[in-house]
């Protein structure tokens, strides 16, 4: 019983020592992290520092002002239009969108023009399924089985397949019948040798 009590006392002392040492380390680590954050904030506030990829910012700009800095790759945005009206900025790669398309649904890059002012009123044009980029032109006269871009008329690895050729089919059938005839003659000769 006494050994159990001694063991529990030693175990509890070790636990408190470990907890105290870990809390000291964590408090030192927090202080060190806060110091580095303060140093970086002071560096950015004292000098006109910029992050990598953000490009140069003019000396007139103050870090504390409310000007929206643009992200890398977004290009220049005019401030006159931004002040006069709220314009939704385009993402890189989307290119210019004309003001006539501004209210319409924007198309993704690579999709090209899908509507025309002359054909918008026609219900036939609106009923045509638009093709995705890379699918090529599909004729409107008859329904074409949709295939993946680059496959052509046959799946890759199949080689050229000609149309129905009756001569080749007849030749294959003749060769198969000839092989069956040879097998039958061999079987007949073996049966005669065994007297069956």
From Swiss-Prot:
Residues 23-48, 58-68, 78-88, 98-105, 115-129, 139-146, 162-196 form a propeptide. GO terms for biological process: neuropeptide signaling pathway. Tetrapeptides may be further processed to GW-amide, which is found in cerebral and pedal ganglia, by a dipeptidyl aminopeptidase. The modification Tryptophan amide is found at residues 54, 74, 94, 111, 135, 151, 158. Keywords: Amidation, Cleavage on pair of basic residues, Neuropeptide, Repeat, Signal. Residues 1-22 form the signal peptide. Expressed in cerebral, pedal and visceral ganglia. TPGW-amide is found in pedal and cerebral ganglia and in shell adductor muscle (at protein level). RPGW-amide and KPGW-amide are found in pedal retractor muscle, ABRM and shell adductor muscle (at protein level). The keyword Signal applies. RPGW-amide, KPGW-amide and TPGW-amide tetrapeptides are involved in control of muscle contraction and may function as neurotransmitters. These peptides increase tension of the pedal retractor muscle and, in conjunction with FMRF-amide, increase peak tension of the anterior byssus retractor muscle (ABRM). It comes from the Eukaryota. This is APGW-amide-related neuropeptide.
